[in-house]
């Protein structure tokens, strides 16, 4: 190859790469607001699953405050990242003003398919609803516990329970309740 051909090839490649990068940036700039709007709608849907009576959801520093139509506080939704068997488990949990759980949702997990992934099932998550205090422990580890672990996925079950218990302890410490 001649030196001129190599330089021409490099210049053409540089122009194509620069143009492609520019076009990609423009597409991102155009679609980002739509993507953000869609993400916000999905979050609102999730919040309404946890607090069906919630009308307004306000992001605070460490939680989402939930209000009804008359601006009365209904509770809070917390974001938890807890170590599971297969990696981090990302959880959203809602507490009412009395400290009882309104709902739990698993956003992300990488647990063992067919076993640990059962932590996302309604039958497991619904066990937490309406409970507080020692009731949130797995029966296997605490005589006052009311949560059944998933057979073959005790570590995953315990991770969800422990994450919720940590948030509950933090709430109690902040409010001065023992």
Listing of model-derived features with the role each one plays in the protein:
Residues 2-178:
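Flexible, solvent-exposed loop/hinge segments and secondary-structure transition points
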């Amino acid at each position: 190859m001649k030196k001129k051909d190599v330089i021409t090839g490099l210049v053409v490649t540089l122009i194509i790469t620069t143009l492609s990068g520019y076009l990609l940036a423009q597409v991102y700039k155009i679609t980002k607001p739509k993507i953000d709007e869609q993400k916000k709608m999905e979050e609102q849907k999730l919040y309404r699953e946890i607090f069906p009576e919630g009308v307004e959801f306000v992001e605070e520093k460490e939680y989402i405050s939930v209000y009804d139509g008359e601006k009365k506080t209904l509770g809070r939704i917390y974001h938890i990242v807890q170590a599971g068997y297969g990696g981090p488990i990302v959880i959203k949990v809602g507490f009412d003003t009395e400290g009882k759980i309104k709902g739990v949702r698993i956003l992300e997990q990488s647990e063992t398919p067919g076993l640990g992934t059962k932590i996302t099932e309604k039958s497991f998550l619904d066990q937490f609803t309406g409970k507080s205090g020692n009731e949130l422990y797995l029966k296997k580890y605490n005589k006052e516990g009311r949560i059944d672990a998933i057979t073959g996925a005790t570590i995953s079950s315990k991770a969800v329970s422990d994450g919720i218990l940590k948030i509950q302890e933090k709430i109690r410490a902040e409010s001065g309740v023992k």
